[in-house]
UniProtKB/Swiss-Prot annotation:
InterPro entries: TANGO2. This is Uncharacterized protein YGR127W. One of its GO terms (biological process) is protein secretion. Signal peptide: none annotated.
Length: 312
């Protein structure tokens, strides 16, 4: 179960974004790079690249005009829309690929659908997207809902923080008990991260962000590759970082088509945008990219790190 955490509460940053991609480790992906004529910075899926080798499915990225987007699967209890065929990963790409787009033309479900007629046939999703220059951010989902998010920069204001996972999204006005446990933990931890790093330099903040992304509430024995243990998929609703877990008999993980034996947090992204929205730092840590990597790497010793800095 993926998770996205974001805040505008730090005095030195317009946005701090932390993202874990939970997936089958054997799923073929490309680490973060500039692509589409160096306009989009993101990792991307290798499973569904187009014939033109230009259109990629991606889960999180930003473009050179300050538009950013992160897609997460939406797990519905009744599995009512599991026959939808369009790739979720196209949504970030479609939004990020448009040059000189006015965010106000995209800022709700109906407007987005006007630009992309495949929205209703896309697999169930929660989609965060925005414009760091205009300082406007939204969440839409496959149920047709639109939420204003991150509308405040006050550290004590709930609207300064946002956490999205694979369950139904609830904004700051919703009943806390409705959210998954990992979302509640992440929300409290995100506020603490800001408070503890008010005077920290950027490297310390980056380190704190990855520490939060790596926070696990599961016993360490669960992820021991020598322990042949099938795990209840529901445990992934309770922990921010999901260690490599052997695939259970049923694949009810809110993920894509099963691929390989292990499922878990395979990639972590930290994105920082300066307060004046002119400087971006984007870091991806690839923890694992195959089942064999479980024995070679770990959350504290990732397989690969990609780091980018650029100006808007």
């Amino acid at each position: 179960m993926c998770i996205l955490m974001a805040t505008r509460a730090h005095p030195d940053y317009e946005l701090i974004l932390i993202s874990n991609r939970d997936e089958f480790l054997a799923r073929k992906t490309h680490a973060t790079c500039w692509h589409n004529n160096d306009f989009i910075l993101s990792p991307y899926d290798l499973a569904k690249t187009s014939a033109e080798k230009q259109i990629f499915g991606t889960w999180s990225g930003i473009n050179k005009e300050g538009k950013l987007a992160t897609i997460l699967n939406l797990k519905l209890d009744n599995e009512q829309n599991n026959t939808k065929s369009r790739s979720r990963g196209l949504l970030p790409f479609i939004f990020l690929s448009i040059h000189k787009a006015d965010f106000e033309d995209w800022d709700n479900y109906k407007k987005f659908e006007g630009h992309y007629d495949g929205l209703k046939s896309t697999g169930d999703f929660n989609f965060f997207y925005g414009d760091v220059i205009k300082k406007q951010y939204k969440v839409i989902d496959s149920l047709g809902r639109t939420f204003d998010v991150l509308s405040s920069t006050c550290r004590k204001d709930l609207d300064s923080y946002m956490v999205v996972s694979n369950g139904k999204f609830y904004d700051s006005s919703s009943i806390p008990g409705q959210a998954w446990e990992k979302v509640k933990v992440a929300r409290d931890s995100l506020e603490n991260l800001v408070l503890e790093n008010i005077e920290s330099d950027e490297e310390k903040i980056i380190s704190s962000c990855f520490q939060l992304a790596s926070k696990s509430s599961l016993p360490s024995t669960i992820s021991n590759p020598d322990v042949l243990q099938m795990v209840d998929p529901n445990v992934t609703m309770n922990t921010i970082y999901v260690p490599p877990l052997r695939r259970p008999p049923r694949d009810d993980l809110g993920a894509s088509i099963p691929d390989g034996d292990y499922y878990g947090t395979r990639s972590q992204i930290v994105l920082l945008v300066s307060k004046d929205s002119t400087r971006v730092t984007f870091i991806e840590r690839v923890l694992y990219s195959s089942d064999e990597d479980v024995r070679k790497y770990s959350v504290t010793s990732p397989k690969e790190e990609k780091r980018f800095k650029f100006k808007l």
